[in-house]
């Protein structure tokens, strides 16, 4: 499981949620899934000029005839347009495509350095502008680390710098615990369309752990671990108590044993006719 590139699949309902939220009859599943794909494709096609500013498109359905589309972006003004012109055009376009009422909402990303998709989009955009990939990756990594991200890993693959043979280049800072399911790891992927071909950009961001290691579910408080001194005192105390209990039990056992032994000796002497 540690070889999984995309960390979301193992963390659904742990610290990640579905990007399409709806539940309908299984007969309608394929149709609605195709509509979701169509909504995302047409939205990105319409916003092609600012596609690098789009982080995520979330789809929520409460009934068959109403669809809510939430677009996450660090620049909501460029998506909304002048007096909401872009939103109105996108709504009309999607309504014609799927024949359902579309409600579009904008979600602002206040910290772009904490969003892996935005970081990947920024790198891809600068690669298309012929920026040096080595300096670009290092500057993006340092920018995220300086903002408080605990771990960053960036990987680019393709004909880097116009080389004839495709290869990969990777930079990493901090830790990326892919095996730890409580770790909040964000992932983003983008493609840079260069004159030499397509360059893929992958970004992993570790933003801390969302679930504690030891928690008390009843009280909702963190359980403090005992120090080694407290542990030794605790075990010494229990060991003394156990010994004292053992001694008491041994005394009772020995007393019973003596009584049983005296009775058995007296009965043996009576049988043999000797005096007690």
From Swiss-Prot:
Binds the lower part of the 30S subunit head. Binds mRNA in the 70S ribosome, positioning it for translation. The gene is rpsC. PROSITE patterns: KH_TYPE_2, RIBOSOMAL_S3. GO terms for cellular component: cytosolic small ribosomal subunit. Part of the 30S ribosomal subunit. Forms a tight complex with proteins S10 and S14. InterPro entries: KH_dom, KH_dom-like_a/b, KH_dom_type_2, KH_sf_prok-type, Ribosomal_S3_C_sf, Ribosomal_uS3_bac-typ, Ribosomal_uS3_C, Ribosomal_uS3_CS. It holds the Pfam family KH_2. Belongs to the universal ribosomal protein uS3 family. One of its GO terms (molecular function) is structural constituent of ribosome. One of its GO terms (biological process) is translation. This is Small ribosomal subunit protein uS3. The keyword Transcription does not apply. It comes from the Bacteria. Residues 39-110 form the KH type-2 domain. The keyword RNA-binding applies. Keywords: Ribonucleoprotein, Ribosomal protein, RNA-binding, rRNA-binding.
